[in-house]
């Protein structure tokens, strides 16, 4: 079923978006198949009136018009629609308007005549209406009003799939009722005045099959104008629900079908001989249907008939002989309850499927027929005029359905849901659904509503509780079972932990192809042979990657081309390096790679925009390495790589073995790739860092820590990391922390040297250290750095 979101919100309007509303509807069991706008995207289209309309002097099929759009002057517009005429209210696209497809309206000349706008058809506005010519608006449409506002076109058509047991939702009222329940909102009740009988005409009813039709209502309405146009609001509501406007009588019955879910039918009173019979077909009877086809009736088919023969297939299809046409003056409205078993399968016997049969065979609210008749009468008198007779009803209380009363045990509810819901909450859910309910001795006794044919057994009530309570609100408890767990080393480092750390550092994970452009790869790794695919997807994807960097740089370029200047990406995956000694002649190595470019931090009013540098990426990598067992043994050793800037590149070494690289992409390569700004990358073997420190708990020292600061002068070539490592090694167990807090070059330091300011924290777990003991540690450190690096204390 397709319905208008705006129409439903007239009944109940929760404070949720369209997307959230669709999610709610789906979780209620009414699966949303699709959502589409009811009109195209356009602006600048207003209600106008054709004040003058004359033939174009140089074109037989064009007309020259003057249109009033509420401005200070009339607009000259050339129109080719055959229905364009004086006095017509139209949809006028004024200068500057933009129609679907980004079609812009400008002043122009057509065959020498000025045209300052465009009179639009439905199709030109992206509105799905089968109509020739331009839109004809009601004569009372206010001139100058925005068409989107006038027709309420900011709306969506939502299509849902219903299971056969939920026929109660085959209407706007039913869907609104469900939305109101889940949002704990009352549904706006439709208020209309029942039309009193103003004439004494009645219709005699001969109910011969009460078991198949326990309730049948007819009403005469005389002197109707079937040529009156259906109001635009009704046509629009029908259109958005997928029903085409035909004439006011048919439109009204279709409107009631959609609004209440009650199928109705209208007969031409002049073509019906009373009494109207409700009976089963007789052998040999035939009926010419409204579509012109002839049905050879079978004896199990319920009919509406008169003394002259069949008038309609009950609850399925009307007959042509009694149908309403343009000459009809008096009509008989029909509203009935047909038993589902009397209709089910009958339409398919004749190759038919109608909106009426679709509802009746699933079940229609048996209390709805009179309300639907009153509503249809009110609409008919409002639109077509006329005089209404009394509502004539024939019914059989014996054969009318009975509302089911079902009991629900607390133990059964808990066992089936695997979750305990408070008693008050369950009772409230039943009340919100419109059910009568009592609770005693851990049992709910529930009486369903007339519109809920599907509530028959205990499990039906459990389903109602679950879907209204919310399937997502029921904990997803895994079943208990005995499992054989695999061995897991405590020292194994989970890759997900590393990914989380990078995401926390404002990186995003990327997944790029293992196939790369050989030209780009040779630019980055000119001395590395690559595997070439014999049958590649394309020339640009014909080589296996020897590094993840080429793919990440492509991702950076992709983002920069889309106005993303700050890019921080990481990727994990295999690189494929040809190796005669490896299995199958290729070494597959799992690596972690990352790339950064742009500013170091996101734009912020309180922060200064600084570009990333080598140490930003190095710091992020060191943070990752701090999670690993060997992170403190990793060294960054200056080394040149083909793809990297010779002055900003280093090899990553663990215990003297190279496990990766880090640095800035070479400027010439950045230029050839089209990258903007400096780009920094690293790549490291995962297996080399895939172990973590196993936590060893120890008591925190309660004795004071002593800090000593040293300013050591060393040669420029001495790495600070090696100096710090030497300090830690020489200081022994009492030296608990070493930190580099300043680097200085300038006055007081000889050229070619630098001053490294280092803090040493000395502490013992068993006693307060004396000055002599502290000085001994400091002396050992000074002696070690003197011997290894010829370090001197700065004056």
Curated annotation (Swiss-Prot):
Pfam families: B3_4, B5, FDX-ACB, tRNA_bind, tRNA_synthFbeta. Residues 701-794 form the FDX-ACB domain. SUPFAM superfamilies: Anticodon-binding domain of PheRS, Class II aaRS and biotin synthetases, Nucleic acid-binding proteins, PheT/TilS domain, Putative DNA-binding domain. Binds 2 magnesium ions per tetramer. Mg(2+) binds at residues 454, 460, 463-464. GO terms for cellular component: phenylalanine-tRNA ligase complex. It is found in: Cytoplasm. Residues 39-148 form the tRNA-binding domain. Its cofactor is Mg(2+). Keywords: Aminoacyl-tRNA synthetase, ATP-binding, Cytoplasm, Ligase, Magnesium, Metal-binding, Nucleotide-binding, Protein biosynthesis, RNA-binding, tRNA-binding. One of its GO terms (molecular function) is magnesium ion binding. It comes from the Bacteria. Residues 401-476 form the B5 domain. One of its GO terms (biological process) is phenylalanyl-tRNA aminoacylation. Its EC number is 6.1.1.20. InterPro entries: aa-tRNA-synth_II/BPL/LPL, B3/B4_tRNA-bd, DNA-bd_dom_put_sf, Fdx_antiC-bd, Fdx_antiC-bd_sf, NA-bd_OB-fold, Phe-tRNA-ligase_IIc_bsu, Phe-tRNA-ligase_IIc_bsu_bact. It is an enzyme of class 6 (ligase). It catalyses: tRNA(Phe) + L-phenylalanine + ATP = L-phenylalanyl-tRNA(Phe) + AMP + diphosphate + H(+). HAMAP family: Phe_tRNA_synth_beta1. Tetramer of two alpha and two beta subunits. Belongs to the phenylalanyl-tRNA synthetase beta subunit family. Type 1 subfamily. This is Phenylalanine--tRNA ligase beta subunit. It comes from Haemophilus influenzae (strain ATCC 51907 / DSM 11121 / KW20 / Rd). The lineage of its organism: Bacteria, Pseudomonadati, Pseudomonadota, Gammaproteobacteria, Pasteurellales. The gene is pheT.
